[in-house]
A protein has these predicted regions:
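Short, flexible loop/hinge motifs at secondary-structure junctions
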Residues: 1-152, 196, 225
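Catalytic center-proximal scaffold of phosphoryl-transfer enzymes
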Residues: 18, 132-134, 139-463
Length: 463
């Protein structure tokens, strides 16, 4: 009888142990997941650098013997002497240290030093005085014609309107601060309505210019696309960009994925070239485009797996970096060895699948839980051509950094202003920001060109 009780007790304890083992495994999985989340930073995930906080390590040189600061071959910007200065102030000694008068002695040219400064800000008021002349022949009174754009008794000129657009769009300064700045510098304080009206007018004039930018991008062999969240009226919207080395296009949409990418505002729905992006799944629904994946994003994801001691991730990371290095030195060597390179790529993926744990049942309905490493491996396998494209074609870049750089200023604007007050204001910013970004890529003076926009002059691009 006692034996039976002990057997029942033993079976009960075994059941408790099995249950606890399952709980422990569940907790260990949760701890691992939370630890991975805490260890995420901009070097091993898609997290932006701003999320690293004060614990971010300094950017020391990655290679031994490397140096910080400006690298060899870096173009400097030393301040140079002007051969024809605006003002020259003579510095002539009148009395010698011994007390003798030397004011009438011959001068010997000595050292010259220059101070480069800006003129003292001053408001300029131009009055257009109309005069009327009566014809002695027919008696008609002929009136002098005001210049185009001079429509009110008192109004702000083109330079002020240009500066307000530039400060708000390109330099991300809020409307109230623009008014304060102009007040401090020039003693004029345009109200919020005037400043926003300048943006709206510039936006309207630039419609055909934006159309030209879109056509240039659509006809390019390689384009970059990306998107980032922005606030419009307090709600999440998405700022999408498609760009090239010479042109930038932005548009605002309420959605991030397919609805936005195939919208009438988008220029990549029928894009036939090579589209570089961050492997966001919606982009692969664009069947007319060939794709290229951002190597920088892949390296960060691989870094996360390397942190978990995954041998396959180390091999894949080294392979991608070696292909990049070889493409810069002699891409023909990569092209010659293409079959071997693709075979090595396949071997790393095959070995990686053996190293990764198989999908685990999570206790919930639906698909089995897969490791992040396995998900990454299958993405690398599925999009092999897009991952390796840069290694065999010199016009295909390794990263999507171009699109990310184009979006970065708008993220700064969100940090400064937090939200766009209206969808109209967001659309104004998108078009104006795309225009100024295009000008800067082509080394065209932004201030002068916006003045030309307001003056009704034709806008021409360098390329």
């Amino acid at each position: 009888m006692r034996v039976k009780e002990l057997e029942e007790e033993n079976a009960s304890l075994r059941a408790v142990i099995i249950l606890k083992d399952a709980k422990i495994a569940q907790f260990e999985s949760k701890v691992k997941e939370l630890t991975e989340r805490l260890n995420k930073n901009s070097s091993n995930s898609h997290e932006p650098p701003s999320s690293d906080g004060y614990g971010k390590k300094p950017a020391f040189p990655k290679s031994k013997g490397g140096k910080q600061g400006g690298q060899d071959g870096h173009k400097g910007g030393t301040l140079l002497m002007e051969s024809n200065p605006d003002v020259t102030q003579p510095l002539i000694p009148l009395v010698c240290d011994c007390g003798h008068d030397i004011s009438n002695e011959p001068l010997i040219v000595g050292e010259q030093r220059q101070v480069h400064d800006i003129p003292r800000p001053k408001k300029e008021v131009v009055a257009f005085q109309q005069y009327n002349v009566q014809c002695p022949c027919c008696g008609k009174v002929n009136k002098g014609q005001f210049p185009a754009g001079v429509n009110s008794a008192v109004q702000y000129g083109t330079r002020i309107r240009t500066l307000s657009v530039l400060l708000n769009t390109d330099y991300k300064i809020p409307v109230k601060k623009i008014s304060s700045l102009l007040g401090d510098l020039y003693g004029i304080t345009p109200n919020e309505g005037s400043i926003m009206s300048n943006n709206r007018r510039c936006y309207e004039i630039l419609e055909p210019v934006e159309h030209r930018i879109k056509e240039e991008i659509k006809s390019s062999a390689v384009a970059h696309s990306d998107e980032t969240g922005v606030r419009v009226e307090g709600k999440l919207h998405w700022l999408h960009t498609t760009s090239t080395l010479m042109y930038t296009y932005f548009y605002i949409h309420a959605k991030r994925g397919s609805d936005a990418i195939t919208d009438a505002c988008s220029i990549i729905a029928d894009y036939p070239g090579r589209l570089i992006h961050d492997c966001y799944e919606s982009y692969f629904k664009l069947t007319k485009a060939k794709h290229g994946l951002c190597g920088a994003h892949l390296l960060r994801e691989l870094a996360s797996q390397i942190d978990d001691k995954k041998a396959w991730a180390q091999l894949m990371s080294e392979m991608l970096l070696e292909l990049l290095k070889q493409a810069k030195i002699d891409i023909n060597q990569n092209i010659k060895n293409r079959v071997f390179i693709e075979k090595q790529y396949d071997i790393i993926i095959s070995d990686g699948k053996k190293e990764e744990p198989p999908p685990q049942k999570s206790g919930k309905r639906g698909k089995y839980k897969r490791s992040k490493g396995l998900n990454l491996l299958e993405r690398l396998e599925k999009h092999k051509e897009s991952v390796l494209a840069h290694a065999f074609d010199p016009i295909i870049p390794f990263t999507n950094n171009l699109a990310e750089r184009d979006l970065r200023p708008s993220k700064i604007k969100m940090k400064v202003s937090n939200t766009f007050r209206s969808i109209e204001g967001a659309n104004h910013h998108a078009r104006l920001a795309g225009f100024t970004s295009t000008l800067r890529k082509q080394n065209i003076n932004v201030f002068s060109t916006i003045m030309d926009v307001f003056d009704g002059k034709e806008i021409t691009f360098a390329q």
